[in-house]
């Protein structure tokens, strides 16, 4: 499965370790035009545009070793895509889209971290187990003005089990 993925997406760089269930194919910065039509529509609705930075990570969930033949031979590819924008001098909004290629999403536990300061979390149980889940998390900082790099981490549970995805989500200057 990994060989096929790398053949189809040769620009991908395998940059992380493999555990017993998932494989991290790394993070990349992408342009607005590289987002799927569905992702573009969502980010535009959230107030983002082609001037924002977008970051994406790819995770492969390995096929099950038990269950039906289809469950045993089909891998699942998870994508998490995120971006952050400043709302006020003390608050920011990070929007994200999670895509699952072959397994419905049962739950997402997502955390946005203003690096070196604080994390903000959200848990979602998507209605009707969709293959796409999206959301956003507000963050705030009221100290002296400071630049924060923003990171996005999500524990994504699908019908194939859990997968963890982490990526940058931009940066923002906050404070008074």
Task: Show the residue positions of the predicted features.
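N-terminal prepro-regions of secreted/extracellular proteins
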Residues: 1-87
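Mature secreted bioactive peptide module from preproproteins
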Residues: 63-176
């Amino acid at each position: 499965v990994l060989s096929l993925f790398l053949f189809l997406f040769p620009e991908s760089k395998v940059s992380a370790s493999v555990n017993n269930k998932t494989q991290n194919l790394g993070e990349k910065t992408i342009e607005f035009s590289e987002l799927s039509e569905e992702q573009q529509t969502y980010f535009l609705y959230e107030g983002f545009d082609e001037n924002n930075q977008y970051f994406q990570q790819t995770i492969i969930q390995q096929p099950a070793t038990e269950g039906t033949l289809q469950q045993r031979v089909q891998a699942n590819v998870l994508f998490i895509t995120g971006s952050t924008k400043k709302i006020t001098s003390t608050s920011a909004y990070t929007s994200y889209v999670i895509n699952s290629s072959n397994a419905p999403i049962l739950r997402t536990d997502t955390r946005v971290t203003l690096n070196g300061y604080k994390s903000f979390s959200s848990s979602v149980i998507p209605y009707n187990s969709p293959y796409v889940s999206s959301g956003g998390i507000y963050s705030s900082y009221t100290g002296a003005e400071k630049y924060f790099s923003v990171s996005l981490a999500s524990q994504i549970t699908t019908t194939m089990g859990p997968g963890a995805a982490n990526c940058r989500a931009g940066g923002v200057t906050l404070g008074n």
